[in-house]
Amino acid sequence: MKGKLLVIGFGPGSFEHITQRAREAIQESDMIIGYKTYVELIQGLLTNQQIISTGMTEEVSRAQEAVKQAEAGKTVAVISSGDAGVYGMAGLVYEVLIEKGWKKETGVELEVIPGISAINSCASLLGAPVMHDACTISLSDHLTPWELIEKRIEAAAQADFVVAFYNPKSGRRTRQIVEAQRILLKYRSPDTPVGLVKSAYRDREEVVMTNLKDMLNHEIGMLTTVVVGNSSTFFYDDLMITPRGYQRKYTLNQTEQPLRPHQRLRKEAEPWALDQEEAVKQSASAIEAVQNTREETAASRALAEEALQAILGESTSAVVHQPIESIFEVAVSPGLANKKFTPVQMTTLAEVVGEKGTMEYTPDHQIKLQIPTAHPDMIIEKLQAASFLLSPVGDVFTIKACDFCDGEKSDAIPHTEELQKRLGGMDMPKELKLGINGCGMACYGAVQEDIGIVYRKGAFDLFLGAKTVGRNAHSGQIVAEGIAPDDIVEIVENIIHEYKEKGHPNERFHKFFKRVKNVYGFDYQDITPKIKVEPAPCGD
């Protein structure tokens, strides 16, 4: 009869964090093999299993005994804290089996049961320090040569990884964490945030927030996990946070913007990272000249330092400061009614965007610019000097007006400009488009926008709740006809303010109208086409 090996990771040690499959595997086993402290941690889950517990450095003998017992027909649970496949017993058990010529099809059955690793459990107590690329390094040289561990620390420090050190120190092994700190300080600021977590989610749990230069002033032991941040990690209200990326985007009138669920974390949701902003190269020639001067100065200093190092016979490494690239986003157009770009405007766009920026024409009669810069004011000044209308991008209010037949049907233009003056660029729960057409032809499709107004026979017709995307898209519901020109601006303004106040984050206007049933006195009617259409993957 073939036995079975259950290699179990039981997480940080608290019952609440042990997975259901791990509990079941412990219950179905005949024998438990593990480090004696780990056996004690799961004592409450044991029934009548035979127990074999050994010391800290006896991993190989535990793996060998487990294989032996499984080959004798027993169901054997080999336990590890955290995840069995991360510095746990899974690899050693496989190695022992491979040495014995084990084959998956014919040998004893083996199941590896995952658990919550220390990097994850400790990160949850610290805040969110592992939100970007990270690595784990064990400082135990029991099974790995210290020279190899040193190389890995050096590489991780240079590459600006968040680093989680496992097994940082023991009673007899004390110098490794000191050496790790020394290597990290070659590349990272002494003020780099560090989190020390001892016995996560256990009775003697301790969490300490410190920094790279002071971390050794605190107690660090075998049960401690040391989490070292990268160059963008910061502390906030006793939390350790690493932003999701090194690129941030911002637009005209917002320092913070609501985060769309389907997008990566953007600068608008990273107000904490402002202090870490570093200038990037600019497109403008004057800025380039200043940058070149700085580069020449830096190069001269580097040569001098290199010569000094050669004389002293020393080698030093520069601290890594990963630049956080700031991307300025803005939408430009010749105007609300004017759809014609001048040669001067096109030349200005090419100049301010430069080689690293991008220009994207949008369906909103605008060109969206994305420009790497630390000086948006200079860009804004140049664009305004070229008579561009500038608008923020994102979840904001945008007017999409027709050209009013090249200005010949101009009666609705003053109302369009007044709405832009009052509401243009206002933050919204979700991007909101107001279509304005100057005659009953509505050839620019105002009725296909979230809100549409059409000037006809000296008055305005009002449309609400168009579904603008999807195969079941439809025009807005006509809720009023013949609105007096003197009233239209106030009516639209009140509708938009009601949506801004009561709309849920990321809720499109047509969904809002359907949910609340009445907006500023206008009742909702379901005019959705009665066809069965699969929902869009994006949820719209």
Curated annotation (Swiss-Prot):
Q: What class of enzyme is it?
A: transferase
* CDD domains, A to Z: Precorrin_3B_C17_MT (cd11646)
Q: What are the entry keywords?
A: 4Fe-4S, Cobalamin biosynthesis, Iron, Iron-sulfur, Metal-binding, Methyltransferase, S-adenosyl-L-methionine, Transferase
The GO annotation for biological process reads: cobalamin biosynthetic process; methylation
The highest taxon in the source lineage is Bacteria
- Cofactor(s) this protein requires: [4Fe-4S] cluster
GO molecular function terms listed in the Swiss-Prot or TrEMBL record: 4 iron, 4 sulfur cluster binding; heme binding; metal ion binding; methyltransferase activity; oxidoreductase activity
EC numbers for this chain: 2.1.1.272
Annotated function: Is also able to convert cobalt-precorrin-3 to cobalt-precorrin-4.
Its recorded name reads Cobalt-factor III methyltransferase
Q: What is the lineage of its organism?
A: Bacteria, Bacillati, Bacillota, Bacilli, Bacillales
As recorded in Swiss-Prot or TrEMBL, the protein's gene is named: cbiH60
